[in-house]
């Protein structure tokens, strides 16, 4: 690595911090589904940062290619989740997790 370039440890620390924020967001937020989806996306982003960091460190492009597949699946998951949420909001006029839990029957 050149002088002034971030090291592998810096990327792994960034990934760990983002993953921790995502976990806290999932466990502390039990009310709003949109924030819950954003926290899950943050978890996926942290995993992607770690994959790219290890891929670059090892000199192998497989991790970077795998990240593109993960981002594609994450985008599809977010689009489907938001579409379901919009349909639910139009019917129930609420996006609270507690209200969605009442759908069990």
Swiss-Prot record:
InterPro entries: NADH_UbQ_OxRdtase_chain4L/K, NUOK/Mnh_C1-like. It is a multi-pass membrane protein. Keywords: Cell inner membrane, Cell membrane, Membrane, NAD, Quinone, Translocase, Transmembrane, Transmembrane helix, Transport, Ubiquinone. One of its GO terms (biological process) is ATP synthesis coupled electron transport. Its EC number is 7.1.1.-. Its main location: membrane. Gene3D superfamilies: 1.10.287.3510. Pfam families: Oxidored_q2 (PF00420). One of its GO terms (molecular function) is quinone binding. It comes from the Bacteria. Belongs to the complex I subunit 4L family. NDH-1 is composed of 14 different subunits. Subunits NuoA, H, J, K, L, M, N constitute the membrane sector of the complex. This is NADH-quinone oxidoreductase subunit K.
């Amino acid at each position: 690595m050149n002088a002034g370039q971030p090291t592998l440890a810096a990327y792994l620390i960034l990934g760990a911090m983002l993953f921790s924020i995502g976990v806290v967001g999932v466990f502390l937020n039990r009310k709003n589904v949109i924030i819950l989806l954003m926290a899950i996306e943050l978890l996926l982003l942290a995993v992607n940062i770690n994959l790219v960091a290890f891929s670059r460190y090892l000199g192998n492009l497989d991790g970077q290619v795998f990240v593109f597949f993960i981002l594609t699946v994450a985008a599809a998951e977010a689009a489907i989740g938001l579409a379901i949420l919009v349909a639910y909001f139009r019917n129930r006029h609420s996006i609270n997790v507690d209200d969605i839990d009442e759908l069990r029957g």
